[in-house]
């Protein structure tokens, strides 16, 4: 379990929004994997079992747009394209969730013919993981090491090891995000991604990634605007209405 901390640092409420913004389509093109070169069906298939969400029957969109939606499948496209274009060999994720990002990474490594994935989560649903064995190729699973525990426990027990790409998607409260960054900042060789960066003006309970990211210096940082920018957005949001995304960090 994550350690319960006292009051959040006063820094947790401070965010600047001073960050370069890039649309996911532009970033994928820069990586040599423009949207038109990717099979959206592959990501949709992975998401069907690991990421698709159901709306509350009480919500307006349930009646106007439908019961199910695809939340930010584009994150898998980014991870896949980074691995393929940069020929990365190792991937660590803090926070497995239901496995969407993990299996998008596995698909990329499988196509490259090599690679390793370590995924860390204190709340793995082992039955869910086993059920996916009948859905996804077995060689994907051979690349994945499932570690049940907190990120602190993982780093405490591990012999120091570096990873080409690290994805931080654990507890989004300030102190935990900061601890994940402190644990990971010397461990990524090429890239690190933070999930759920919110620009000033977007407020959501326990979403405090931005305050940590805005205080990070000496790295290149890009906010990738992505949620339903490639896949259909049945909310009808314009690009300007998407005031959140994922932050890609790489060394200068």
Residue ranges and their predicted role:
Residues 1-70:
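Rossmann-like AdoMet
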Residues 62-70, 74-252:
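S-adenosylmethionine/decaboxylated-SAM
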């Amino acid at each position: 379990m994550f350690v319960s901390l006292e009051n959040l640092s006063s820094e947790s409420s401070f965010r600047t929004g001073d960050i370069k913004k890039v649309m996911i389509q532009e970033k994928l093109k820069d990586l040599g994997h423009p949207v038109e070169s990717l099979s959206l069906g592959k990501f949709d298939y992975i998401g069907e079992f690991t990421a698709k969400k159901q709306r509350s029957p009480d919500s307006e969109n349930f009646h106007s747009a439908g019961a199910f939606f695809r939340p930010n499948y584009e994150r898998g496209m980014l991870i896949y394209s980074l691995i393929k274009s940069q020929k990365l060999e190792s991937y660590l994720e803090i926070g497995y969730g239901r496995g969407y990002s993990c299996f998008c990474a596995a698909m990329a490594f499988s196509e490259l013919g090599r690679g390793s994935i370590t995924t860390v989560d204190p709340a793995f649903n082992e039955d869910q993981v086993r059920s996916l064995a009948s859905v996804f190729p077995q060689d994907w699973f051979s690349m994945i090491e499932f570690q049940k525990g907190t990120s602190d426990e993982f780093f405490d027990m591990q012999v120091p090891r570096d990873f080409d790409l690290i994805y931080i998607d654990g507890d989004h409260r300030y102190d935990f995000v900061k601890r994940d960054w402190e644990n990971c900042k010397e461990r990524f060789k090429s890239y690190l991604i933070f999930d759920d960066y919110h620009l000033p003006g977007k407020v959501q309970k326990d979403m405090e990634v931005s305050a940590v990211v805005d205080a990070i210096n000496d790295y290149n940082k890009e906010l990738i605007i992505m949620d339903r920018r490639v896949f259909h957005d049945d909310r009808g949001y314009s690009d300007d209405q998407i005031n959140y995304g994922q932050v890609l960090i790489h060394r200068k």
